[in-house]
UniProtKB/Swiss-Prot annotation:
It catalyses: (1S,2S)-OPC-8 + NADP(+) = (9S,13S,15Z)-12-oxophyto-10,15-dienoate + NADPH + H(+). GO terms for biological process: jasmonic acid biosynthetic process; oxylipin biosynthetic process. This is 12-oxophytodienoate reductase 3. Induction: By wounding, locally and systemically. It comes from Solanum lycopersicum. Residues 342-343 are annotated as: FMN. The gene is OPR3. The keyword Flavoprotein applies. The active site is at Y190. Specifically cleaves olefinic bonds in cyclic enones. Involved in the biosynthesis of jasmonic acid (JA) and perhaps in biosynthesis or metabolism of other oxylipin signaling moleclules. It is required for the spatial and temporal regulation of JA levels during dehiscence of anthers, promoting the stomium degeneration program. In vitro, reduces 9S,13S-12-oxophytodienoic acid (9S,13S-OPDA) and 9R,13R-OPDA to 9S,13S-OPC-8:0 and 9R,13R-OPC-8:0, respectively. Belongs to the NADH:flavin oxidoreductase/NADH oxidase family. Expressed in roots and to a lower extent in leaves and flowers. Signal peptide: none annotated.
Amino acid sequence: MASSAQDGNNPLFSPYKMGKFNLSHRVVLAPMTRCRALNNIPQAALGEYYEQRATAGGFLITEGTMISPTSAGFPHVPGIFTKEQVREWKKIVDVVHAKGAVIFCQLWHVGRASHEVYQPAGAAPISSTEKPISNRWRILMPDGTHGIYPKPRAIGTYEISQVVEDYRRSALNAIEAGFDGIEIHGAHGYLIDQFLKDGINDRTDEYGGSLANRCKFITQVVQAVVSAIGADRVGVRVSPAIDHLDAMDSNPLSLGLAVVERLNKIQLHSGSKLAYLHVTQPRYVAYGQTEAGRLGSEEEEARLMRTLRNAYQGTFICSGGYTRELGIEAVAQGDADLVSYGRLFISNPDLVMRIKLNAPLNKYNRKTFYTQDPVVGYTDYPFLQGNGSNGPLSRL
C-alpha cells in the first residue's frame, strides 16, 4: 500500500497546481445529481450542501446543470440558462469561495435520457439517434415512480450549432455566477456520449459513421466553450468504456484516445492547457448496478486508464468507486493527479478530513439520493465528533 493511515506521507494530501488553481489536497467532490433544485432553481439548501463539503484549497464539481430547457432528465435539477438561475448560483458559489475552495459547474445535456414530461411542450427528447434507451433502464419521473425511456428525435444537422451555442452561453453564465470554471459532461450515456459511442450513433451525416465524425460534436462544444471563457477554466469528462444507458462502443480504447488527441490539439491551438480531463473508470456503479462495460478485469481497467492518462497532456482526474486506499494508490503510482469521490461524499460531508485521519465513514442511504427533501439524506449526515460545517475538524 502506498501510504499508511496517518504517516504524514499520504499523497492525496500533497499540494497540486491545477493550471491556475492551487489545491491543498487531491480529494475532489464528484458531480452528482441530487434533485434538490425545485423548479430547476438552485435553493438555499444547495449552498449548505456544497459549503459542508468545501475545504480550503479543495476542489468541488457541481451536480449536472441544465444548459437549456431541453436538457433535463431528472426532476428538480438546477439550470444555468436563466438570469434567476445565475443569480441563485452566485449565492452558492460565494459561500464555497468563503471556505477557500475552488468550484466548477458541470454543464449537462441528457439527450435521449429524458422523457416528454421534462421537455418543453411535451416534445420528444433530442439525441444523435431515434433509438430509445432499452427497457433494461428506467427513468425517474417527477412523482418518484420509474418510467420507460421514450423514442427520441434525431437532431437535425442544422440544429447542432444551437446546442453548441447553449453550451457556450451556459459557460459564460457560469463565469458570471462566479464559478471558477466549468466541466463539460461528455460521459455516462448522455448527449455528447450519444454522439461518441458507435453503439448509439447511427447517423449518416458529418456527425456519424467514422470515429472522426463521432468526435466532431464534442470537439465543437469544447472549442466553443474554450473560446468563450478560456481553456484553463474548462474541464472535460468522458467515459469511453462504460455502457451506462446503453452507451456501448466497439472499441473504447480507440474512442478514448481519439477524444484525448482532439483535446490535446485544442490545448495546443489555444496556447493554454485545459483545466483537466476527468475519466470514469470502466467499473462504475450507477443506480445500484455495476456497469463493467466491455472491459471487466482490473488489469484491463488499469490498462485503459493508464493509456488515456499517459496520452493526455494535462491534469488527469480519475473517478468511479474509489476508496481511500485506491485513491492513495492511484496518485502514488502516477495513474491520476486528482481523485473524485461521489457516494462517499454524500454521506460524509467531511470526507476530506476522514480520509486524512483514516476515520470511519458514515453509510449512505440510497433511498434519499434523488428526493426533494432539503435536509434528510442531504445536509443531515453527521460530521466527525458532531462538528458542523464550520467546526474545527471541517477545516484543513
